[in-house]
Amino acid sequence: MRALVTGVGGFVGRHLVHHLQEEGDEVCGVSRSAGALNMAATPVSQTDLNDLSAVERLVQETRPDAVYHLAAQSSPAESVTNPWGTICNNLLGQLNLFEALLSADLHPRVLVVGSSDEYGQVRPEDVPTNEDAPLRPITPYAVSKVGQDMMGFQYFAQHGVAVVRVRPFNHTGPGHDARFVMPSFARQIAEIEAGMREPVLRVGNLNVARDFTDARDMVRAYRLALVEGTPGDVYNIGSGRSVLISRMVQELIALCSAHVEVRVDPALLRASDIPRQEADTRKFTALTGWQPRIPWHTTLRDTFEYWREKVREEKLCAS
């Protein structure tokens, strides 16, 4: 299968490319950044998805059988400070991709990656959350993901594009950048252990619970969704278990050799937060048989070890 992966230079994109190649797929990546051009054994096109003519050239040159659309501004916090950029980037790039496929008369299967944040302020009776729960987004990022989700359905319904939509819950692992909760804590703790910052871990609201899946399991689910999913349908992907952020913090601290004080930073508290997210994945599991394979403690350890090594390298470079 010839697969086109947008956002190939991102955290999930790199894991997905590795998995697709293991499955024997021929992969072409797309990235706005030149930094992704050096990916081993993967041709990468530096293409701005907001440029329709560039996207048209891309699909004509690659003629994919499968499209994994991962490219997006993916930080909810960043979307609050830059709603214009988030919504324009996330919607226009996908719109251009669909229009380019129609213009080229190509008919690949397309995976549109939404987010559990689409569900937003979930009612207590809707946890665990299934695909029929109402969408009540509370950040510009979440609004953009609802837009991508609905656009995917519209192009399926109106134009017959073989779109499969997924709503992944939180996913993390080694290589995840420090804008996000687990890698942010892991980096801070690694810096404390290395003597590069005061022994204080700055945190936001620790009394919320999130459903975490290892990214290496998530990308397996993405390929299964694209290959086995029903065009026009939508699937939740997650572990089906929620973890308190306070528990995550304590387990990360236990992995390091330093004393760490936990301190709430008011700047990290959100005006509105979702108390608990937990996926009901029965629909996707019944279709594909997918289950997470990597235990929570392994994801936690691997993420911390990634940042421990990265911090060591940074310390060496600075000395």
Regions found by a protein language model. Name each.
Residues 296-319:
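Amphipathic terminal alpha-helices
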Residues 3-22:
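N-terminal Rossmann NAD(P)H-binding glycine-rich loop of SDR-like oxidoreductase domains
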Residues 81-99, 103, 109, 117-165:
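Catalytic helix-loop patch of NAD(P)-dependent Rossmann-fold dehydrogenases
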